[in-house]
Amino acid sequence: MSHPALTQLRALRYFDAIPALEPHLLDWLLLEDSMTKRFEQLGKRVSVTLIREAFVGQSEVEEASGLLPSESRYWLREILLCADGEPWLAGRTVVPESTLCGPEQVLQHLGKTPLGRYLFTSSTLTRDFIEIGRDATLWGRRSRLRLSGKPLLLTELFLPASPLY
């Protein structure tokens, strides 16, 4: 199963540098904290619509080439993050199989739990970068995060109903 928002997410084109944008946009696009937490701070009930969770081969995660270690299998999770039932964000997480050892194995079992609820409670979380992307009228971003030094790639597309617009 797929979703049109995930097709748009995969079509994001990234800027070489942070573009000169309105402060409101940059505030959302460069947020270092959890989007789940940000949505909840707006008084919204946050839920996850799980689109896909599975191991996939390299050919299904080409956007990770050069950003993650080259491996034969990756854990792929695709979701819609909803605020009061309305989709505000499409998310795609690519996790190399080698990252899934020790406590990070929980990444395979999040189900309908928002990723941010796990990531941003970890004292071992670091972020290597945030890149801003755009597809037509929609904005997105991707980040390489590390848990205990082990990488994963998180891509987020802000959907039309989100407060970014």
Swiss-Prot record:
Its EC number is 4.1.3.40. GO terms for cellular component: cytosol. One of its GO terms (biological process) is pyruvate biosynthetic process. Keywords: Cytoplasm, Lyase, Pyruvate, Ubiquinone biosynthesis. It is found in: Cytoplasm. It is an enzyme of class 4 (lyase). One of its GO terms (molecular function) is chorismate lyase activity. SUPFAM superfamilies: Chorismate lyase-like. Its main location: cytoplasm. InterPro entries: Chorismate--pyruvate_lyase, Chorismate_lyase_/UTRA_dom_sf. Pathway: Cofactor biosynthesis; ubiquinone biosynthesis. Pfam families: Chor_lyase. The keyword Cell cycle does not apply. Substrate binds at residues 35, 77, 115, 156. It catalyses: chorismate = 4-hydroxybenzoate + pyruvate. HAMAP family: UbiC. Belongs to the UbiC family. Monomer. NCBIfam families: PRK11655.1 (NF008656). Removes the pyruvyl group from chorismate, with concomitant aromatization of the ring, to provide 4-hydroxybenzoate (4HB) for the ubiquinone pathway. This is Chorismate pyruvate-lyase. The gene is ubiC.
